[in-house]
């Protein structure tokens, strides 16, 4: 094979070793990571505004860490869905559809978890006041869904623009995606972990999204 020189991240060989990270989804795991001087890979889906308190506590707790490795890795990475497209609204709608399907019924992250949609709805920022009266149709009367169906239905009705505005998804055209990443940056996150290859997004659009992130979004954070 004739492979041109390429930069590999993270570096497989580092002194004394590559940074140690921990997959975390809840406050107790953030505390464990801080206690042992481990970086947080936060895979809990949520709006940045709701994550700030956890990042602040992690930063404070890690000051007294007893590191399990050769150094303290005081870093926090937020997971979210990322989709960048040439058409702003189309990309937001597709990103919204993709993350809702990602957490759809009987998916790995939702199967056999009775309260998953109630918790997701809360972590995504809840039902906004201006939509509360419209969403009330899911409770009571002929459309009463009961048994966790209400928060699932409400979650499914949250507008794409709202999810993007809250930073639940980083989606839209390059300018919107830059603003979305900034929402995570502003609460103290060091990195954004963007899942792009969801099954609801066609492969050609995934490739275009990667191209736009590489050419237009990432350079905005070069400094």
Language-model-detected regions and their locations in the chain:
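An alpha-helical appendage that flanks or caps ligand/catalytic pockets
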Residues: 1-9, 49-189
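A conserved active-site cap/scaffold subdomain adjacent to cofactor or substrate pockets
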Residues: 25-55, 59
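Conserved, mostly hydrophobic/aromatic
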Residues: 20, 33, 58, 91, ...
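Short glycine/threonine-rich loop-to-helix capping motif typified by GTGT followed
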Residues: 84-88, 202-212, 222
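Glycine-rich, proline-tolerant flexible connector loops at the mouths of alpha/beta enzymes
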Residues: 45-48, 194-207
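Hydrophobic faces of well-ordered beta-strands that scaffold small-molecule active sites
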Residues: 20-23, 38-43, 74-81, 192-194
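A structural motif corresponding to the C-terminal end of an alpha-helix
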Residues: 32, 36, 183-190, 220-223
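Aromatic- and glycine-enriched pocket-lining scaffold segments that form the walls
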Residues: 2-38
């Amino acid at each position: 094979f004739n492979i041109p020189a390429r930069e590999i991240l993270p570096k497989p060989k580092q002194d004394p070793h590559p940074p140690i990270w921990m997959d975390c989804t809840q406050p107790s795991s953030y505390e464990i990571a801080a206690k042992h001087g481990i970086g947080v890979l936060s895979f809990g889906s949520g709006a940045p505004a709701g994550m700030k308190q956890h990042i602040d506590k992690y930063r404070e707790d890690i000051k007294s860490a007893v590191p399990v490795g050769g150094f303290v890795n005081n870093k926090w990475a937020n997971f979210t869905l990322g989709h960048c497209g040439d058409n702003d609204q189309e990309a937001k709608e597709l990103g919204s559809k993709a993350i809702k399907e990602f957490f759809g019924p009987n998916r790995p992250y939702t199967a056999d978890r009775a309260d998953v949609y109630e918790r997701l709805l809360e972590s995504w920022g809840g039902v906004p006041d201006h939509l509360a009266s419209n969403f009330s149709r899911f409770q009571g009367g002929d459309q009463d869904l009961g048994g966790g169906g209400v928060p699932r239905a409400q979650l499914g009705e949250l507008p794409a623009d709202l999810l993007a505005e809250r930073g639940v998804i980083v989606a839209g055209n390059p300018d919107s995606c830059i603003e979305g990443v900034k929402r995570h940056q502003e609460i103290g996150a060091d990195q954004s972990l963007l899942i792009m290859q969801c099954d609801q997004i066609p492969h050609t659009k995934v490739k275009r999204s990667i191209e736009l992130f590489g050419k237009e979004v990432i350079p905005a954070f070069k400094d």
